[in-house]
Amino acid sequence: MRLSMRRALLAAGLALALVLAVHLGQRVLECQAVLGGPRGPRRTMRPEQEDLMMVGADHVEYRYGKAMPLIFVGGVPRSGTTLMRAMLDAHPEVRCGEETRIIPRVLAMRQAWSKSGREKLRLDEAGVTDEVLDAAMQAFILEVIAKHGEPARVLCNKDPFTLKSSVYLSRLFPNSKFLLMVRDGRASVHSMITRKVTIAGFDLSSYRDCLTKWNKAIEVMYAQCMEVGRDKCLPVYYEQLVLHPRRSLKVILDFLGIAWSDAVLHHEDLIGKPGGVSLSKIERSTDQVIKPVNLEALSKWTGHIPGDVLRDMAQIAPMLARLGYDPYANPPNYGNPDPIVINNTHRVLKGDYKTPANLKGYFQVNLNSTSSHLGSS
């Protein structure tokens, strides 16, 4: 099993390297043509004006470029990123779609090239400057986001670990906005462990280790969010989104500059429908977001974390207190839910919501296997 997984990762890495090589090769040739050859006089390149054009099923033409207001949704896995993107997908003007998985990998590679002084020197010597790399990254990311789903007026990407690169992405796409999903780390970690959601570097046999890694990841993402600025990055608390969906979504849509639609409150009604919410058959959150917003998962972690970890919680995960959570509250008081959420929860517990026909036969396989969310450390 390990060998086949390594081979799969190696194959994915080689494929990714090939795609990037093609993009970079094109950019280098363009640069050399504009700059007068590989050793010609250096001049500032003209900014590209080319847009990506797509035609929707309604025969409407959509044009996408680096100046468009992209939306990036991210956070530590198991923090409500799938729920958030499903709600946005329910909006008639927005399309997020499933995780691409490839965008955070590409961003991690770009970061690695920048951190290595020797590698950067080699790239610069070869004419693969930061300008060339950034143009290639911009084109590649936009192409993946635009073409992995149906076109829409507003495009959104949900890959949890992309928000470790918010500052860089805001440079590539200056009008983009970011939604950082924040959830009580104890709940996120309990969900990872019980649902066996493997994440690079997280030891799923240890609450202490996972909480330490959660703290490190959310610290990086939160710092990036603050650096980008409150006008471009909005922390969204999962608990408040669940308890008060209408109030929270009004704030979110106002922040994004998108008109209100009641459809965002009923994402479960639009699953699998044209122009609605497309769900992956293999993502671990799919079996949860087919249901309406409910309280089922809010405090499931209470009573499961070892006593020694609870005792040291403030030291293990100092970001809990920084984000406004009481590290010693067990169970915590997140607030009182809206009546609609209470009603939804009663209906979910009664079993009113069934798996859509197009998704049946996959969840049991998923729950008995592992799923990797790879993030740069």
Curated annotation (Swiss-Prot):
Annotated region Interaction with peptide substrate: the residues are 101-105
User: Where does the record say this protein resides?
Assistant: Golgi apparatus membrane
> What is one GO cellular-component annotation here?
Golgi apparatus
What SUPFAM superfamilies would the database entry show? Answer: P-loop containing nucleoside triphosphate hydrolases
What does this gene product do? Catalyzes the O-sulfation of tyrosine residues within acidic motifs of polypeptides, using 3'-phosphoadenylyl sulfate (PAPS) as cosubstrate.
Q: Report further notes.
A: Substrate peptides must be flexible in order to adopt an L-shaped conformation in the deep binding cleft.
Name of the protein this chain belongs to? Protein-tyrosine sulfotransferase 2
Source organism per entry reads Bos taurus (Bovine)
**Source species taxonomy:** Eukaryota, Metazoa, Chordata, Craniata, Vertebrata
| Originating gene | TPST2
